[in-house]
Amino acid sequence: MKMFNNIKNTGKLIRLERIFDKKSEKTVIIPMDHGVSSGPVAGLKDMRTAINSVAEGGANSVLVHKGIVRHGHRGYGKDIGLIIHLSAGTGVSPDPNEKVIVTSVEEAIRMGADAVSVHVNMGAPTDCQMYQDLGKIAETCEYWGMPLIAMMYPRGEKITDEKDPEFVAHAARLGAELGADIIKTNYTGDIDSFKDVVKGCPAPIIIAGGAKSTDAEYLQMVKDSIEAGGAGVASGRNVFQHKDVIGITKATAMVVHENADVEEALKVIKK
């Protein structure tokens, strides 16, 4: 895949092909790590059903914590990639923006992971520790041939707007500078400003799915991010909390991989 031409580690390249579409060179990831931060939220009470639904809808990968792997493993149907999240923090913590490492790269390898992810909140009181963690994990991932996704969010006292293009561009570049292979971050809200974010980051960028919105608004955001040079989407609540999980996953994949119009993609969602 051309976007990963700068990666020479064969192990990373083989694993990346399991979470990216080889033709479009883009990805649809469904994060399902919310149980740690928020508890068993709607849509994720039955993890096996949730994972089965997005797999049947054509998602490239799910992203979960280590304890969920055994509960969501699929022995049938469509293949789906596995990304194991290494960071944790809860919404009831004294500092919800603090993330600590709870899983090792080696443990993720033993579980069959195709990639690992780390969460960093740029601007949080403990952000320097998160930077250190990311840098160390990047070194370990390079050694083992494990792709690393950095979830890079501008969040903290000095962050006036988490979607501000300058903050988003800084967060994305920070993740790439510290060794991440793929960056997940906020969409800035318009194509031109996100183009600048993509231009300033040497690693491919996928956008977060954002807050719950209408199907049309969500799919338009995804389409705009792709037009701006994004490499896909990692969408949680807009997918797994949908009344037609399979349909919205299919629609997302159509926009990301087939460059479908929003109106066309909306037709596959059951009303």
From Swiss-Prot:
Primary enzyme class: transferase
E.C. designation(s): 2.2.1.10
Any GO BP annotation: amino acid biosynthetic process
Residues of the active site: D33, Y153, K184
Residues holding 1-deoxy-D-threo-hexo-2,5-diulose 6-phosphate: D33, H34, G35, V36, S37, Y153, P154, R155, G209, G210, G236, R237
GO terms for MF: fructose-bisphosphate aldolase activity; hydro-lyase activity; transketolase or transaldolase activity
Annotated family: Belongs to the DeoC/FbaB aldolase family. ADHS subfamily.
Function noted in UniProt: Catalyzes a transaldol reaction between 6-deoxy-5-ketofructose 1-phosphate (DKFP) and L-aspartate semialdehyde (ASA) with an elimination of hydroxypyruvaldehyde phosphate to yield 2-amino-3,7-dideoxy-D-threo-hept-6-ulosonate (ADH). Plays a key role in an alternative pathway of the biosynthesis of 3-dehydroquinate (DHQ), which is involved in the canonical pathway for the biosynthesis of aromatic amino acids.
HAMAP family: ADH_synthase (MF_00960)
Name this protein carries in UniProt: 2-amino-3,7-dideoxy-D-threo-hept-6-ulosonate synthase
Source organism of the structure: Methanococcus aeolicus (strain ATCC BAA-1280 / DSM 17508 / OCM 812 / Nankai-3)
Organism taxonomic ancestry: Archaea, Methanobacteriati, Methanobacteriota, Methanomada group, Methanococci
Gene that specifies this protein: aroA'
